[in-house]
Amino acid sequence: MKMKLFGRWDYEDVTVEDPGLRDYINLKPMLIPYSGGRHQKHRFGKAKIPIIERLAGRLMTSGHLGKKHKWTSEHQTGKKYNAYKIIIRTFEIIEKRTKQNPLKVFVKAIENAAPREETTTIEYGGARYPKAVDCSPQRRVDLAIRHMVWGAFHGSRKKPISIEEALAEEIINAYNNSLKSYAIKRKLEIEKTAESAR
């Protein structure tokens, strides 16, 4: 018997094309992706957490826009079951709109939205300068998921659109490399800033 995500979506035809991200997007077949925090004490243990569980974890802190808590996330925090329900409904919408495996669409969206370089601050003699640096694969995946969730959450906030519809729209736009996607816009911004700081 084949293991399917939530008993519905197949893992078999899903592959990661970007060789840099291949080891950091865990697509190990699981019915319900839940690791119970087994990897949290290990360095780079995050890479072993299923990618859907990482999305669920990010959905629970959706209001944190950078260091600003523009809106609170208290209505989501700790409610993993609610996060999984959002993911299931989002994947249903993606499947209906694209006629493709939503897991495949989501993985491709992460690949498209992951920034390749960013800036860091270096201090020389009391003055600070921005310096372009390569983004590690783990951070690339983290930023892609974070930006997709932020885009969806802030796109549905105080609007008649639900979080599931907003997240589906965000993932589909990132999959299509569309500038309507907040994640793609942020990626281009980050890379442009890094290019000017070389």
From Swiss-Prot:
One of its GO terms (molecular function) is structural constituent of ribosome. Pfam families: Ribosomal_S7. Coiled coil: none annotated. Keywords: Ribonucleoprotein, Ribosomal protein, RNA-binding, rRNA-binding. GO terms for biological process: translation. InterPro entries: Ribosomal_uS7 (IPR000235), Ribosomal_uS7_arc (IPR026018), Ribosomal_uS7_dom (IPR023798), Ribosomal_uS7_dom_sf (IPR036823), Ribosomal_uS7_euk/arc (IPR005716). One of its GO terms (cellular component) is small ribosomal subunit. The keyword rRNA-binding applies. PANTHER family: RIBOSOMAL PROTEIN S7. Part of the 30S ribosomal subunit. Belongs to the universal ribosomal protein uS7 family. One of the primary rRNA binding proteins, it binds directly to 16S rRNA where it nucleates assembly of the head domain of the 30S subunit. Is located at the subunit interface close to the decoding center. This is Small ribosomal subunit protein uS7.
